[in-house]
């Protein structure tokens, strides 16, 4: 992060239990609240401090070369997967996890990315 944090103005905040690092842009949550997501702070009241400012995360995988992997948050994983397949993408795998429904896709040019639908365990967050 010594390179990217100052380059993009990110703050790197370690997550609990070795789960990686949250990348924050200070004030991003306030920007979202003022523009497209007025209820963001109320919805995330139980989240870690500054969670509304999170723009990504970083996890270092042992024995894997450094690379970027992009995850797009979507409203409906299955609809997004169906659209991607119709446009020529290949589904590499999908998983339903505690907080998300994810699918790893390969676009027609060969780039891999994930689509992720937020699904809190209690159904509302």
Description of each model-found segment:
Residues 1-93, 104-125:
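Glyoxalase I/VOC metalloenzyme domain signal
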Residues 98-100:
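Short, small/polar residue-rich loop motifs at catalytic or cofactor-binding pockets
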């Amino acid at each position: 992060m010594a390179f990217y944090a100052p380059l993009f103005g990110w703050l790197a905040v370690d997550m609990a239990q070795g789960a990686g690092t949250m990348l924050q842009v200070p004030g991003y949550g306030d920007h979202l609240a003022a523009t497209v997501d007025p209820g963001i702070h109320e919805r995330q009241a139980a989240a870690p401090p500054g969670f509304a400012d999170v723009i990504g995360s970083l996890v270092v995988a042992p024995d894997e070369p450094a690379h970027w992997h992009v995850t797009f948050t979507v409203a409906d994983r299955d609809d997004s997967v169906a659209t991607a397949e119709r446009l020529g993408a290949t589904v590499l795998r999908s998983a339903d996890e505690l907080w998300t429904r994810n699918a790893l896709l390969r676009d027609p040019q060969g780039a891999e990315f994930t689509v992720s639908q937020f699904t809190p365990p209690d159904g509302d967050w």
